[in-house]
Amino acid sequence: GNVVNVSLREDSEALEEVVVIGYGTVKKSDLTGAVGSVQMKDVSQVGITSADRALQGQIAGVQVNARTGQPGEAMMIRVRGSNSLAGGNEPLYVIDGMPVEKMNSDINPEDILSMEVLKDASSTAIYGSRGANGVVMITTKRGSTGDTVLEYNGYVGVSSLRKKLDLLGKNDYIAMVNEVSQNDGTGIAITPEQAALLPNNDWQDLAYQTALTHSHQVSVSGGTDKTKLYSSLNYMNQEGIIKGSNYNRFALRINGDQKLAKNLSLNASIAYSYGTQNTANSSADGWGAIAYTAMVMAPIQEIKDADGKYTNFSGTPWGGTNPVGMAELYKNKAVNSRLLANMSLMYDIIDGLTFRVNAGAEVNAGSSDRYIPIGLSAGGKLNGDASKSKSNYYTLINENILTYDKKFNKNHALNLMGGITFQTYQY
């Protein structure tokens, strides 16, 4: 037989990579806990619309699934499965050292440098019970020493229904209806003359669309030995494959680093995002889910009646709302704005001994408006249906951390850390 000699090359560069862990960093070669890392430069070419999608298929033991597939919807992330039947299973999210309430689609993925997922008890223990479901560490881009760089990043993509269901067309549907009528002894239900006047609607074509997604970002970065700055402005628009659904996001970020003295430095970040989400009715509970009614509406059903009103289907015990009317008239709009601001002051007391003070704030404001008019069967049952809600919350956090990190020789090093955290939450 043939002999194949294979020589593996050591990837020393990967071992020297710095991984972000709780309240610090460590070289990958020195890492002992279960931590998965994603460099955004490796996934940015895919054209992801939100930060959480960057984790899909990238880290072992981390499940990232869509909830309903609506544009702008936050993904469901599970680190090594679900740990609680009654409590929450979402991991803790930490952006540039600041724990945040939740991961929304309003976090601009173009601003992210890397993401680390802390998976085991030794890695998440420093966060206590908050880290019981894992911790997702997000590090954003910062300025570097050198010339000022003005950069534009953008992409355009399309999405469409992968495969339509093979449903009956007009002729096959009429043949089936007549066969059922004859078997019942009632004769032909639809004559050829009547059939000639009936439409042949493909409700899947009428309910779904080829959706366009586009994102545009302008960023400026650069700095000197003492001052470094990164700023970005982003706009993203994502259409859903169901007509009437879409998501728009506007995001602004400014990250700055300043060397105040030989042993004193300041880091600051501020990020603002504003998102608008219009969702299609996706529930299958009799309220007229578009995906459901596009399957059960008869191809010979008119889109509108003689009065110009949308028709509704009553050919099943559950009924059905016209999917075209639902896409046009159903309104479910959510607006969310979020402000994240944090600042870190670091003082090198002696060689290896550093004291750091962090202060941060998260302010979130959201509103939701839902309306089903009386012209749709789902709304007609209630003589129309409308709801409105608002939610506002803020988080303030202060951390005081003392770290001693000393490397004595090639084989011996010592790292000690102690601190106290104060956090308040108002809903």
Please give the residue ranges for each predicted region.
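Extracellular and analogous surface-interaction loops
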Residues: 347
